Amino acid sequence: MSQSSKTLKNMSKVNEAFIKPFPSSNKIYVQGSCKDIQVPMREIILTDTIGELAEKNAPIHVYDTSGVYTDPNVKIDLRKGLGSIRSTWIEQRNDTEILTKLSSNFSNERRDDAELDVLRFEHLQVPRRAKNTKNVSQMYYAKQGIITSEMEYIAIRENCKWQEYKDQIGQNEGESFGANIPDVITSEFVRDEVSKGRAVIPANINHPETEPMIIGRNFMVKINGNIGNSALGSSIEQEVDKMVWGIRWGADTIMDLSTGKNIHETREWIIRNSPVPIGTVPIYQTLEKVNGIAEDLTWEVFRDTLIEQAEQGVDYFTIHAGVRLQYVPLTINRIIGIVSRGGSIMAKWCLAHHTESFIYTHFEDICEIMKQYDVTFSLGDGLRPGCIADANDAAQFGELETLGELTKIAWKHDVQTFIEGPGHVPMQMIKENMDKQLKECGEAPFYTLGPLTTDIAPGYDHITSAIGAAQIGWYGCAMLCYVTPKEHLGLPNQDDVKQGIIAYKIAAHAADLAKGHPGAQIRDNALSKARFEFRWEDQFNLGLDPDTARKYHDETMPKQAAKTSHFCSMCGPKFCSMKITQEIKTIDAGEIAKIKAIQIEMDKKSAEFLKNDSEIYMKEGA
């Protein structure tokens, strides 16, 4: 038995650092119309303002992606997986059935292989599928006028109790570039957006552990975190750890991009322990099944992979259906030809067979599979630019136009769909991408990798890309795929995952502020108030990364007394602008009267000066 196998057999607990509650925070649940709709949020408890400005500060509620991992009342056992949230809702709709056997040949082969027992997730669930090839997608329900429990859950979650603060805290006016963001998100608004294809709810019926979330430009900007093994490294336990770590810091969805060993088993462990939607690129595993030879790929093997992953519970598939034979020659004169793994695989297949890809020709067959499990399309940008010199070229935009055509086909089948975008794009060319996507794809949600705005900073591409991510998020991009410092350099570790997610949480939040998303500024204002009042602990705790903020402060002022001091090590006690401003704010009425009297006299002298032709010296004889 390998060391990895031994570890898996005993893998029940999560690293304590991954699940400890955030400081001064409570996990709260807001109940919906029935008891089984319990929407999680994080409540940040604030200290009172003291001194002459004394007042109580209400707690701040923030969107929480960490699932039950940060709930001290829930015992986590990775071997058993998470509890089901949506099973009852799915059963009550009475349009699915539990299968008597797995539908995928590959799944059955893996299950029958006794040598894999040491790697297998122990508590495998029996998958569901729509009855009689019915449609069980959230889009189908939305078009029927049905508000599902998932939609109600999302409405509560998106509002995040911000209405409690609306009379207390102001917000700058935003520019939403034609988005339609209401003051209050209602269940009906969620239904309407999904029915029109402007938003998606990735929620496979075989992933009932998910806490429902939504992706669309009229909702908060979301971020995705990538994990996954490679042929050169990582293990099942490391990938599960990365998933838990990623959602702690704010990943709204996770993509498992595994290309190494035991992809099937790795994915099962991740899905069963994930409270957020899981996405994959099915062509990666399909390629593994044909021993890495792209020319040997077939529709039959790909179809079996789709069914295998749908029955495991994958919530969205990246499908590179827009890589058409006619677009491949357009990439020849690029500096960096085709950088998408999936795109390059399909381009090679198209050239080898000199025909359109089986993904493109069988697209409606794929829709038939997706709708029976409610798997969402993430239509992949296989021809995205890999450097800023290649941005916005004919290959990229030709593929985007095809994705728009495929979106309409998916919608005809009531299959939820969003669109993937670049890539590497300089700042002045980003808005063109967003505008063209909205036009070509009928306002289907856009999901971009950055984009990276410059190519000169290996090791810092979480920054080069977060700049572009904030910008395109402002213009209307619905979800941002994070980039880590290891981009272009290697497989990210846990610290890289955190760095990438924090950079993208900043970008997404900055975009929400710029759009004028209701309630987006509450946290900023609360932190600013804490900063002005020298409530250091509140400053740390309101931040996206309290641990790092506290660490940086304590490097120069480590003593507990420094947590109440009215200065930091940057300015010291004599030059703190906020301390001086506080003193100005506490000037008494008598002093203010003196200042006003002086101003009146100054105004008189000014008028007298102007009356005398604005001359510094009096003219002779005057």
UniProtKB/Swiss-Prot annotation:
UniProt keyword Metal-binding present: yes
Residues annotated to bind substrate: 226, 255, 284, 320, 340-342, 381-384, 420, 447
BP GO annotations: thiamine biosynthetic process; thiamine diphosphate biosynthetic process
Assigned keywords, A-Z: 4Fe-4S, Iron, Iron-sulfur, Lyase, Metal-binding, S-adenosyl-L-methionine, Thiamine biosynthesis, Zinc
GO cellular component: cytosol
Keyword Nucleotidyltransferase part of the UniProt annotation: no
Sites where the protein binds [4Fe-4S] cluster: 568, 571, 576
Single GO term (MF): 4 iron, 4 sulfur cluster binding
Database matches in InterPro entries: ThiC, ThiC-associated_dom, ThiC/Bza_core_dom, ThiC/BzaA/B
Cofactor annotation comment: Binds 1 [4Fe-4S] cluster per subunit. The cluster is coordinated with 3 cysteines and an exchangeable S-adenosyl-L-methionine.
Cofactors: [4Fe-4S] cluster
List of residues binding Zn(2+): 424, 488
EC number(s) recorded for this UniProt protein: 4.1.99.17
Substrates-to-products reaction catalysed: 5-amino-1-(5-phospho-beta-D-ribosyl)imidazole + S-adenosyl-L-methionine = 4-amino-2-methyl-5-(phosphooxymethyl)pyrimidine + CO + 5'-deoxyadenosine + formate + L-methionine + 3 H(+)
Superkingdom per UniProt: Bacteria
Pathway stated in the Swiss-Prot or TrEMBL entry: Cofactor biosynthesis; thiamine diphosphate biosynthesis
PANTHER family referenced in this protein's UniProt entry, alphabetically: PHOSPHOMETHYLPYRIMIDINE SYNTHASE, CHLOROPLASTIC, THIAMINE BIOSYNTHESIS PROTEIN THIC
Quaternary structure and interacting proteins, as annotated: Homodimer.
Similarity section: Belongs to the ThiC family.
Record's function text: Catalyzes the synthesis of the hydroxymethylpyrimidine phosphate (HMP-P) moiety of thiamine from aminoimidazole ribotide (AIR) in a radical S-adenosyl-L-methionine (SAM)-dependent reaction.
Protein name: Phosphomethylpyrimidine synthase
Annotated source species: Ruthia magnifica subsp. Calyptogena magnifica
Gene encoding the protein: thiC
